[in-house]
Amino acid sequence: MNAAFQQPVTDSKTGDAPAILEMRGISQIFPGVKALDNVSIALHPGTVTALIGENGAGKSTLVKILTGIYRPNEGEILVDGQPTSFASAQAAIDAGVTAIHQETVLFDELTVAENIFLGHAPRTRLRTIDWQTMNSRSKTLLTALESNIDPTIRLKDLSIAQRHLVAIARALSIEARIVIMDEPTAALSRKEIDDLFRIVRGLKDQGKAILFISHKFDELYEIADDFVVFRDGRAVGQGRLKETPQDEIVRMMVGRDVENVFPKIDVAIGGPVLEVEKYCHRTEFRDVSLTLRRGEILGIYGLIGAGRSELAQSLFGVTKPLSGRLTLEGREISINSPHDAIKAGIVYVPEERGRHGLALPMPIYQNMTLPSLARTSRKGFLKAAEEFALARKYAERLDLRAAALSVPVGTLSGGNQQKVVIGKWLATMPKVIILDEPTKGIDIGSKAAVHGFISELAAEGLSIIMISSELPEIIGMSDRVLVMKEGLSVGLFERDQLSPEALVRAATGNA
C-alpha cells in the first residue's frame, strides 16, 4: 500500500476528525487493463477533496466502486472505521454515498419532481406516493439552488443547464454524508456555479465529506481543501491544494510539463466553404449570418441561452430553420435532416456525447463506423475486416486508449468517448465539422492533445466551427470569433482583436 495515502491530510476545520470513508489498497482489474492499482484514499467530514487526473487515470472507476456499480478485485472500504461492502448502488446510498455525475442520468418523460425523488418518493399512510409533499420538497430543493424550475413539468422541456440543476437537487434530496460531484459545473453559467459552490460550502458546514472531480483548475482552487492526483490507475500525489502550484499538479497528472495547451498552427486561410445568411429558428435564434473559410477555426462564444448549440443543430439538420439561406462551396443547399448534412459533408460533434453522440452499449468499432457503412460494405453485406481497419485507423490517429475496439464504448472515460465521436465523423471525410464544447469534461493533458488535433485538421484544409464556453480555449484556438447573445449574432472578432474583456462585453451586452 502507498504509505502516503494511509493518513491523508485533514481539513483544519475538522482537526483530527476520523475519516467518514476510507478506501485501502483498492485494485480494479478488467480484461487486459488494471484500472486501479492499490489505491488508498480517505474522505474527512467538512472537507472538499479534489480528485484530479487525466481521462483514463481511474477517476470514473473509483466513482463506480464508491457508488456500488463495480466491486473491487482487491482492497477494502471502511465507513466510520467499519469494513463495508457496496454490493449494489442501493447499498452505497444506504451507507450515505450519493453522486452527481458528469452526464446527467435522468428521464425525459418523468416530471422534475419524479426525477428528483425517483426511488425514494415520500409516501402517504396508505403507502401511495405523496405527490403534494414530493412537489413541495422538490420546489424547496430547487429554490435552494436559486432556480425557479417548476417541479411539475417534464424533464424533456428543460435546457442542459437546468437538467444539471435537477441532477444536483436529486443528489441533495438523499440525506448523504459523502457527496461525489463528477464535473457538476460542466453546463452551468458562472452564476449557477457560484450558487453551487454556496451549496457545497453549506454541505461542508454540515460535516459532509465531498469528493469533487473537475478539470477546471480555477474551480478546484476556489472550492477544494485537499487533493489527490491519479495517473494510470495509481494515486501519485496528495496535499493541500491551495499550497500546491498548478504546474506541480499538472506534472503529477501527466508525468511531464504541458507547455502549450493551445498549439494553434498558423494556416493560410482559403476561400469561403460554408455561408449562412439570415438563418432563423422559431424560438432559439434569428438573423444569424456567418462565413466559414477553408482551413479556418471559427469560434462561437456566448453565455448559456445564447443559441449557439441550437444554431449548430440546425446546420446539422436536427432542427429545421424557419428561414435563411445556406451555401456550401458556392452551391445553395437545403439541410432538412442529419442525413442531408452528412451527405453534403457537414458533421456535428454534440455537447452531450453520451446522449446524442454515441450508442453506449455498442462496441467502439461499430460506433466509429456507423456513419460510414457504405465504405465498409459490399452489395449490402458488411465487411468486418474493413470495418475494423477503418475504426483502427482513426483510433490510432486520435490515440484512443482502450483494451480493444470490441469493448462497449460506454466503458471508456469521457475523453476517450469524445475521441470516438470525433473519429466516427472524420471517417466520413467531411468538409465542415462543428465541435460543440469539444473539451467539455476533458483533463488538461488530453485537452492539449485535442487542441493539437483540431489545429492539424484545419491545417489539412478542414473547415471547423468550434463552440466553447471557455474563454482561454476560444481565444487560443480561433482564427475569428462570432459572439451570440439571446439568439442574435452581436459581434465578429478577428484574431488580433480577441480578449476576454471584449468577448464578455459583447456576450453580456456591455460592449
Curated annotation (Swiss-Prot):
What is the role of the protein in this entry? Part of the ABC transporter complex RbsABC involved in ribose import. Responsible for energy coupling to the transport system.
Give the family per the record.
Belongs to the ABC transporter superfamily. Ribose importer (TC 3.A.1.2.1) family.
Q: Pfam families this protein is in?
A: ABC_tran (PF00005)
Record's Gene3D superfamilies? P-loop containing nucleotide triphosphate hydrolases (3.40.50.300)
> ABC transporter domain: from which residue to which, for each copy?
21-257, 256-511
Q: Where in the cell is it found?
A: Cell inner membrane
Q: What is its EC number?
A: 7.5.2.7
Topology within the bilayer: Peripheral membrane protein
Q: How does it assemble?
A: The complex is composed of an ATP-binding protein (RbsA), two transmembrane proteins (RbsC) and a solute-binding protein (RbsB).
Sorted UniProt keywords:
ATP-binding, Cell inner membrane, Cell membrane, Membrane, Nucleotide-binding, Plasmid, Repeat, Sugar transport, Translocase, Transport
* Residues annotated for ATP binding in this entry: G53, E54, N55, G56, A57, G58, K59, S60
Q: Which reaction does it catalyse?
A: D-ribose(out) + ATP + H2O = D-ribose(in) + ADP + phosphate + H(+)
What name has this protein been given in UniProt?
A: Ribose import ATP-binding protein RbsA 3
Question: Record's Gene Ontology CC terms?
Answer: plasma membrane
Chief subcellular site? membrane
Which superkingdom heads the taxonomic lineage of this protein's source? Answer: Bacteria
Q: Lineage, please?
A: Bacteria, Pseudomonadati, Pseudomonadota, Alphaproteobacteria, Hyphomicrobiales
| GO MF entries | ABC-type D-ribose transporter activity; ATP binding; ATP hydrolysis activity
